[in-house]
């Protein structure tokens, strides 16, 4: 699905009946996060300069869900970054509709967002996700400390707010440079 299809799905989810009722608050809050990040994120000049040199056609599959807080923070940044890679196409795939995620587990779990970059023949070239290294280290540290889940989420989203997508941009820049030998 493209971004418009995804946002339409999200709108329907906000009306109820698609996800568990307990997800309602997450759906609303994450829509605000998604919209804010999509509106405000701007790629750096370095990313734009490097990404314009990518000529090999690729398809980027982003596995996501509207209820996922990490996805609400990362997917809009990913979409904005992809706008600068002229040879890249993308699609959004819902984690809970289909079995694609089962091929890309993170430590045995279905962590999202997950990004799969494929070549023209459909071969996987790269997989990223569900978080930047820095966000994952924060998550792992808090989890190891046994903090309550709501404290973990507050800390992680506080980190996302301060970072403003720059860690993701930096990681993706390094991956693109390595993948395409730029």
Which role does the model predict for each range below?
Residues 89, 99:
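Active-site rim loops that border cofactor/substrate pockets in soluble metabolic enzymes
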Residues 1-58, 84, 95, 102-111, ...:
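Non-globular targeting/processing and membrane-anchoring segments
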Residues 49-80:
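Local sequence-structure signature of Cys/Sec-based thiol-disulfide redox active-site neighborhoods
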Residues 91-93:
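General small-molecule cofactor/ligand-binding pocket signal
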Residues 66, 96-98:
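Short, solvent-exposed coil/turn elements at secondary-structure transition points
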